[in-house]
Amino acid sequence: MVHFDRHGGRIWAEPRGRALGYHWPQYSIHRGELQMMLLDAVRARLGEDAVRTGTVFEGFEQDGTQVRARLLDRASGTAETVAADALVGADGLHSAVRAQLYPDEPAPLWNGIRLWRGITEADPILTGRTMVVMGSNATSKIVVYPISMRTERRGRALLNWAAEVRLADDRLDWDPDWNKAGRLEDVLPYFADWKYDWLDFPALMSQAAEILEYPMVDRDPVDRWTFGRVTLLGDAAHPMYPIGSNGGSQAILDARVLAHELAASGDAAEGLLAYDKARREPVNAIVRACRDMPADRVLHTVSQRAPQGFTSIEDVLSPDELNTISGAYRQTSFSDVEALNSRPSYTAAR
């Protein structure tokens, strides 16, 4: 990962995955491809009818032995009640399960940033595997990174890009929706001159087949996910700003820990409580941290001190400041590497 100012000046770089010392690589993958991989795996293990679509969750009741979910088939209008040992609400930012658990919760909180995202096939940038972060979220910022090894093998890159713009008007005038279509003419003016020897960002946006637009929102952390035989997972449990690749990654970790605790406990209610205990506080800390990331503070400082760009980052940040950035990063990263590499697997004993 390499951080640049808005003019293309290199600020600092951070290794990732095996380059940092982890036992495992770091992957960036198309969300739809990952979802289809998971769908295929679920059907292979649980049967073709294990996943149902077009069904609306309308509520639940529970007692000491089971939970009953009320469902509605969108196409036929048929109502149905399904009983189970546990109910996991993994239904996103507008979670209906969470709404029943927290009926008085206010609307999602917006930080004033509007975000446009797209995917474009293009020539590789920098090493071909680099994640680029450029600009400042105090004004405008972009993130670009490759998400397909198949495209890489053809000498091309499938680049996922995000463009952030902080607006003067902090009123959220539409309902947050991860699938709202965006318009090139709305975002292009903010980045019309973001062109560099190795990246033409206006062209990258213009060549995307589809653009999505949404506000950067989260919710305040809650002090409980699990209620008896019902729990929350992913954005339903901890919606956070999409910073640091944490949104989807934390949902995957939720699922991994949940599966481990359910298998280890042998009792659904106990497993849900153990999952809540293991995950909630660490993830709530990430939700709060995403509101004020140290990396974003550095990018903002550079943009304030050198609004027209710089020749050398040493002219903008003092040696002590650079050492503080790299030292804090190393301390956090390498301690995490050691802990993760030595931690027992979440795979439950069979």
Predicted regions and their residues:
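Short, flexible helix/strand-to-coil boundary loops that buttress conserved ligand/catalytic motifs
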Residues: E14-P15, L101, P202, G244, ...
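C-terminal helical "tail/cap" subdomain of flavin- and related membrane-associated enzymes
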Residues: G8, G244-S245, H260-R350
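Glycine-centered loop/turn positions within well-structured domains
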Residues: E58, V67, S95, S140-I142, ...
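Conserved mid-domain beta->alpha element of the FAD-binding
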Residues: V88-G89, W116, D186-V187, Q207-D296
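Conserved FAD/dinucleotide-binding core of flavoprotein oxidoreductases
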Residues: R10-Q35, D73-V82, P106, E121-E210
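Histidine-centered metal-chelating micro-motifs
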Residues: S95, L115-R117, T139-V143, A237-H238
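Glycine-rich, phosphate-binding/catalytic loops in enzymes
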Residues: Q100-A107, R154, G248-A251
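Conserved N-terminal helical subregion
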Residues: M1-Y102, P106-I119, D170-D173, K180-E185, ...
